[in-house]
Amino acid sequence: MADDGLLLNFSLGDNNIIQPETKLKGGTWRDRLSAKKIAKHHAKGPRTAGDEDSTPRAPRNPNRIEVPSSRPTKRQRTDGGDSGKQQSHTHPHSNQPRQFISSLFTKNPEPQKVEEVKEEGHVEDAKPTNAPLIDGLDTFTNLGLSPSLAAHLLTKLELKAPTAIQKASISQLLKEEGDAFIQAETGSGKTLAYLLPLVQRIMALSKPGAQTDAKGQPIVHRDSGLFAIVLAPTRELCKQISVVLENLLRCAHWIVAGTVIGGEKKKSEKARLRKGLNILVATPGRLADHLDNTQALDVSNVRWLVLDEGDRLMELGFEEEIQGIVKKLDARQRPSRIPGVPTRRTTILCSATLKMSVQKLGEISLKDAVHIKADPEDEDEKARRSKEEESAYRVPAQLKQSYAVVAAKLRLVTLTAFFKRTFMRKGSVMKAIIFVSCADSVDFHFEVFTRKQAKEDGDESSDTDKSEDKPPSSPHGTIAPATAFSNPSNPVTLFRLHGSLPQNVRTSTLGAFAKNKEASVLICTDVASRGLDLPNVDLVVEYDPAFSAEDHLHRIGRTARVGRDGRALIFLQPGCEENYVEVLKRGYRDGGKALTRADANDILKRGFGGNVESGNKDWETKATDWQCEIERWALENPEYLEMARRAFQSHIRAYATHIAAERSMFNIKELHLGHLAKAFALRDRPSKINVPGLRQGKEETKKDFKAERNSAAGKKRKAGGTDLADDIPSANNTATAAQKMRAKMKEHISGANEFNLA
């Protein structure tokens, strides 16, 4: 068919041209949907006056009554009709999540219970309940200890008189050989209460002159066998018991003690067991492992078994291990060739509380046990009480305890203000402990309180002499100057401790905190709340409440020990947490009359330089500036931002683990997650806070510390060699680390070698 040359031209209006639709990619489906709606709205363009008249309208209802409106008619815009353009350029990033900076002092919930705020200076000093006895007749010699041991306590350890629980337990355990349950309040000297009779019994077996061999040496020495085992729930408590025991045995050098705990090398522990031990301090898990796998551990002569902190042993799940240990000790027991050794084993259970778990542990290990306590005259009263009151804890009478109801947004600045005021004057407080709920929170707050100030960064380059006066920092990153609440006249050193650190780092950090003679603060989890006798601890702050009342008892028990004065402060949030005050009052003999309340605003005023009585609001400005500075510091450093998010998530998980009896007071549904996120220097919405990967475990943390130590030692690598771990992050993002590891391995495998001739 021939072309006729016909051309057709169609005229279309500009409004009828169909624009190509751009397909949005990336982001969540909600973000794509909102961006699509915005693009569709902009594509319509601005409406004109003619458009409104040209649109067809529905027929008017004849039954409708027209009422004249008093509102004047709108005037037409005369600015060129660029309202649509202005609207389109107002929020160029409207599809991205915006950060909302909330104010510290607005929309905070008010405390539900209004109580009178008492000043600590107006509280009458109570008589110490765990101090040594003043009566001169109650000396260690009168209790049955040998003169050499009593003289060693007086001259070397500077112990002149026993405490009430030591008096009751030493006399009972030296007279009879039956099982015993020792119950006393924290800080009353329970460790010496069972160690002194133990050492006295073993010294009596090896008394020179009465029982000696042909060479005149005592019969009992390190090769004579193992006579006593002391079990403790934590490694730190085992270390402390071992130190106290070694100090006692300096007057009997022929008796040898040792430890086997988790985290140490089994090879070195087996070597110590082969050399011979008379007293062994151990954790249940490691002792059960040695009983199964170490032939050098002979327990046929064990006649004393001590279970320290029995309630904690059961809480940590050591019930099966303890059952296995008791059965193996019974099965392997043999008559001893050494004269004077008892025929049966004596078991001693120690605990500050008498709970159902402790009673169950007593059923496993004790037989016809004697209940030893500091106040034997109160036994009839306690027998009449209910089981709940029997399990109630006791707080030392000289401990001054207070609580502060602090809103969630103000927690971080209030804690900082409190320690600014505490360490404002040199010598007022020497050592303090901050207890938090999880290890991630410990790491985050340690970085916040030890971060370098902007002024310090500029001074370091010019003033090199001032750096010599700063407290030494730890190569492991667990010790650093506390720049947040230090001042030139009173520098403060901050220590951190939690269970995810390697054992050698935990031991060195705890030892450095105990030996430090300057102002220092330890921020830790409950790993340091049981049995540790840290010297000169004047203040305990529970930033996160304990998971049970018994844990609270052991936390505040780190201060006010053996008759010393001490203070404790707990942070509570407005709302259901205020009911926890009744639990705190039950721990006092007088019903909680000595328990005081601290006002959160007064803490902020004192800490940030304001006067409590004046109406000046400068302290609010200073507190807000400090909070915003911390938030900017976290935003500028991705590492610290991820640390803050991880700490926030771990804190929420830990908050949900309170015991059932107290869960109504710590209801996770009552938490304002947005306000709580601000206490972790976060500006994100709680729903947007997501941290990939898992927290480093003990093994990964141990590898990181080992790698840092090797790099510090300056080990040289072989020429031409490469390390696979160079391109791998420190396991913060597990998926990325695994992906990079596979890529690195593929590079090594695919490279040319002697088998790849091509």
From Swiss-Prot:
Family statement drawn from the similarity comment of this UniProt entry: Belongs to the DEAD box helicase family. DDX31/DBP7 subfamily.
Protein localization: Nucleus, Nucleolus
Domain Helicase C-terminal: 398-603
Domain notes for this protein: The Q motif is unique to and characteristic of the DEAD box family of RNA helicases and controls ATP binding and hydrolysis.
Domain Helicase ATP-binding: 171-372
Residues engaged in binding ATP: 184-191
Catalytic reaction equation(s): ATP + H2O = ADP + phosphate + H(+)
Region feature (Disordered): 26-99, 111-130, 455-483, 691-758
GO MF annotation terms: ATP binding; ATP hydrolysis activity; RNA binding; RNA helicase activity
PROSITE patterns assigned to the protein according to its UniProt record, in alphabetical order: HELICASE_ATP_BIND_1, HELICASE_CTER, Q_MOTIF
A cellular component term, taken from the record's GO annotations: nucleolus
GO biological process: endonucleolytic cleavage in ITS1 upstream of 5.8S rRNA from tricistronic rRNA transcript (SSU-rRNA, 5.8S rRNA, LSU-rRNA)
General remark: Present with 1460 molecules/cell in log phase SD medium.
Stretches with biased composition (Polar residues): 84-99
InterPro entries: DEAD/DEAH_box_helicase_dom, Helicase_ATP-bd, Helicase_C-like, P-loop_NTPase, SPB4-like_CTE
Ranges of biased composition (kind: Basic residues): 35-45
Signal peptide region: none
CDD domains, per database record: DEADc_DDX31 (cd17949), SF2_C_DEAD (cd18787)
Basic and acidic residues composition bias: residue spans: 111-127, 696-709
Motif (Q motif): 138-167
Keyword set, alphabetical order: ATP-binding, Helicase, Hydrolase, Nucleotide-binding, Nucleus, Ribosome biogenesis, RNA-binding, rRNA processing
Enzyme Commission number, as recorded: 3.6.4.13
Pfam families: CTE_SPB4, DEAD, Helicase_C
Record protein name field: ATP-dependent RNA helicase dbp7
This protein's record includes keyword Nucleus: yes
Organism: Neosartorya fischeri (strain ATCC 1020 / DSM 3700 / CBS 544.65 / FGSC A1164 / JCM 1740 / NRRL 181 / WB 181)
